[in-house]
Amino acid sequence: MATGIPASELRELSNEELTTRLKESKEELFNLRFQMATGQLTNNRRLSVVKKDIARIYTVLRERELGLSTNPGGDAA
């Protein structure tokens, strides 16, 4: 049951919260890749889900950078 974070939920977060989520997701991806290399990974689907979550976070940040969406937590960066 590996489901990702919906983009609509990400759009409600501030830039600081998004960067925090991005950092956490990158750390999780690193750990999953390490588990895969050592043969300890039991849920292969989670690897793909985390990658897509990272892409969604980058997309929301880029939308704000281009002014396509607003930042609910403060000024548009």
From Swiss-Prot:
The keyword Ribosomal protein applies. Keywords: Ribonucleoprotein, Ribosomal protein. It comes from the Bacteria. InterPro entries: Ribosomal_protein_uL29, Ribosomal_uL29, Ribosomal_uL29_CS, Ribosomal_uL29_sf. GO terms for molecular function: structural constituent of ribosome. Pfam families: Ribosomal_L29. GO terms for cellular component: cytosolic large ribosomal subunit. Belongs to the universal ribosomal protein uL29 family. This is Large ribosomal subunit protein uL29. It comes from Corynebacterium urealyticum (strain ATCC 43042 / DSM 7109). The lineage of its organism: Bacteria, Bacillati, Actinomycetota, Actinomycetes, Mycobacteriales.
